[in-house]
Amino acid sequence: MSAKLIAVEGDTVRIELNIKLSRSMLESEETILNALNEAGCRVTGEALKRFDTDGSAILIGGTKWTSKGEEPKYYQTPYGEVEVLRHVYQTSAGGKTFCPLERDARIVVSSTPRFAKVVAHKFACGGSTQVESDLAENHGRHVARSYLQNLRKR
């Protein structure tokens, strides 16, 4: 692990990166990309948490929704997959659930808005095979083609 979360103070996140350089420039660049992606994941995880609730009951259309507690979910970001514990709500009647974080952060399927935008742009230039390859080669992001196709439909 090369990216370490040092502090979260108000709107500021401080991280520390330790990157081992190589005698090969290409290898060094790959190591730098991986470290920056790791840092991006850590900071994006903190950014996503800011859109969550404190777990208090909420009213939607006059109906009371209560938190089922914090449940983990993986989100796709430009930097990698991030796991976030977030509150999921349900009415006393059961049925469908609601996640305020996903509404307020404008999550698309399970992608952050920036990642969804990147994927949409890449689809404008080619099919899912090319998008999958481009993300892996140019961004260090390995994403299943089936996920990309599902994201494209949204």
Give each language-model segment a name.
Residues M1-S92:
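Short, conserved DNA-binding cores of transcription-related domains
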Residues V82-R154:
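Short, positively charged, Gly/Tyr-enriched micro-motifs
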